[in-house]
């Protein structure tokens, strides 16, 4: 009897969706509900979905069968997708911090060639997001649900220089002090 090839690896199970979305199964747990006649078992799944171009979402689903729990989690993840601005399509624009419950996450932008240095559930989020270079550290909890929610809290704080400039009513060039052609350094500092 031939076995099907096992899916998995460091990022969990990965499937391509029809609409260019990649979903990663982060965790699956067997949970029990105690009823009069004994225990009723179900499965809880946690899934991360992303387009690898700056959009990512997560969802949890619970059902009596594993495939149904994964399907529910995937549907919820698609509905909760957020857009994260990326620098050069490979990393974040700046370092950020997020927390949820006891979970704290520090996410740092990294130079090209660094790779994804992140543990467990955070790695699945960054791979689905399309980030190639990032350093992330989880503090305070190892619970995958809280770790992912803290990671999303950090990613929601991320913004692009253009967005920051528009909030301040300036241009991105003004924000970074880029000189216009012909200006000397003294003219830039004197305003």
UniProtKB/Swiss-Prot annotation:
Keyword Ribonucleoprotein annotated: yes
Any GO BP: translation
Keywords in alphabetical order: Ribonucleoprotein, Ribosomal protein, RNA-binding, rRNA-binding
A GO MF term: structural constituent of ribosome
One annotated Gene Ontology cellular component of this protein: small ribosomal subunit
Domain S5 DRBM span(s) in chain numbering: 21-84
A UniProt-annotated Pfam family: Ribosomal_S5
Region (Disordered): 161-191
Basic and acidic residues compositional bias, start-end: 171-182
Cited PANTHER family: MITOCHONDRIAL RIBOSOMAL PROTEIN S5 (PTHR48277:SF1)
Subunit structure: Part of the 30S ribosomal subunit. Contacts proteins S4 and S8.
Described function: With S4 and S12 plays an important role in translational accuracy. Located at the back of the 30S subunit body where it stabilizes the conformation of the head with respect to the body.
NCBIfam families the record matches: rpsE_bact
Family (UniProt): Belongs to the universal ribosomal protein uS5 family.
Notes concerning its domains: The N-terminal domain interacts with the head of the 30S subunit; the C-terminal domain interacts with the body and contacts protein S4. The interaction surface between S4 and S5 is involved in control of translational fidelity.
Name assigned to this protein: Small ribosomal subunit protein uS5
Species of the source: Gluconobacter oxydans (strain 621H) (Gluconobacter suboxydans)
Gene designation per UniProt: rpsE
